């Protein structure tokens, strides 16, 4: 009896295992069928959307073309950017105006340079020649009035101007003598032979005269 019960239990367990395997296989099959149906439905929706909106594909191709061209889209005079024909014309006009503005300045500089070139340069040889001529006149004439008048005519100075300079030189010399201290030879300061027997504070006869 016990052997029959155990065999019955084993057969029942085997049947249960077979049923479970068949159920698992059936479930996997149903899952595969559902997945295929879901994917087919999704593809159909994508195709319908693409047919319903034909502009999206064109926009996508245009976007790809812009990316390939480095991000530059439409071209023309109205489009802002360095490639537009309007900007090119404006750039050429601006450059032409700048050149016109710079042309007068260049002409002025050229005229100044030409004037500088035309001005005669003073050479040291001419000055030395004049000095030699003046020295020759002074040596030949001495202190005569004719020689002085000749020198005045040579350096184009009138007698009034010469007298004015003479007065100014005399006044300058007089004021300079007054400003300089007059040296006093005293017995205590220096051994002057004329002041050896003189008393303290007696003025030396060789001192410069006071004014």
UniProtKB/Swiss-Prot annotation:
It is found in: Nucleus. Residues 119-176 bind DNA. Transcription factor required for differentiation of embryonic stem cells (ESCs) into primordial germ cells. The keyword Disulfide bond does not apply. One of its GO terms (cellular component) is nucleus. The gene is Rhox5. Residues 38-129 are annotated as: Disordered. This is Homeobox protein Rhox5. Highly expressed in placenta. Lower levels in testis, epididymis, ovary and skeletal muscle. It comes from Rattus norvegicus (Rat). Residues 102-119 have a biased composition (Basic and acidic residues).
